[in-house]
């Protein structure tokens, strides 16, 4: 078996492999918008995060339609979402709730480019890396405020450190 993914967190490293016809991996929790399971004709809001833990945080905050890209910020979006395009067509707005680090900001830009005008972007407090940190630091009401205050933003307005490297 070939290692297809690796996740590092405080104090441990998790490796996994996959021998499956679903390579690349589907987005985590994508079945939440499966047309066979959803009674609504249109899903008003789907939230996309960078990690599974963030999806669980959003579910806890009352947002059932939340998914995570399958391989974090390094995900190949076209391969990951291609099979689910018919499912994604039933989604009106896509809230992108990315991490605040450089890979997370880059992922936000890529997701915005990929999904286009229906994207809304969140803004996290400066001392939080992701929405799970917001829950731990500020509580569930602030998580809800962040999601409810998501706004459209042009991808040209999203700047990463790499794009400003020459000016530093």
Task: Give a label for each model feature.
Residues 1-92:
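Phosphate-handling DNA/RNA-contact segment within nucleic-acid enzymes
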Residues 53, 73-76, 98-108:
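Acidic, metal-coordinating catalytic cores used for nucleic-acid/nucleotide bond scission
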Residues 58, 96, 168:
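Conserved RecA-like P-loop NTPase ATPase core
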Residues 81-89, 129-144:
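Short, surface-exposed amphipathic charged segments that create phosphate/polyanion-binding patches used
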Residues 106-116:
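Short, aromatic/basic amphipathic alpha-helical patches
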Residues 119-128:
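A generic structural motif
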Residues 151-160:
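Interdomain "pre-motor" coupling segment immediately N-terminal to P-loop NTPase/helicase cores
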Residues 159-168:
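The Walker A/P-loop phosphate-binding site
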């Amino acid at each position: 078996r070939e290692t297809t993914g690796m996740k590092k967190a405080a104090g441990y490293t998790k490796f996994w492999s996959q021998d499956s016809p679903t390579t690349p991996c589907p987005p985590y929790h994508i079945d939440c918008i499966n047309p066979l399971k959803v009674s609504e004709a249109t899903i008003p809001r789907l939230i996309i995060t960078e990690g599974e833990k963030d999806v669980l945080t959003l579910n806890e905050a009352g947002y059932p339609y939340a998914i995570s890209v399958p391989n974090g910020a390094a995900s190949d979006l076209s391969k990951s979402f291609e099979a689910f395009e018919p499912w994604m067509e039933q989604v009106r707005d896509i809230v992108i709730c990315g991490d605040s680090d450089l890979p997370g900001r880059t992922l936000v830009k890529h997701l915005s480019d990929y999904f286009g005008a229906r994207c809304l972007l969140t803004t996290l407090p400066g001392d939080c890396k992701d929405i799970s940190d917001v829950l731990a630091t500020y509580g569930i009401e602030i998580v809800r405020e962040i999601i409810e205050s998501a706004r459209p933003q042009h991808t040209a307005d999203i700047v990463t450190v790499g794009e400003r490297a020459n000016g530093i």
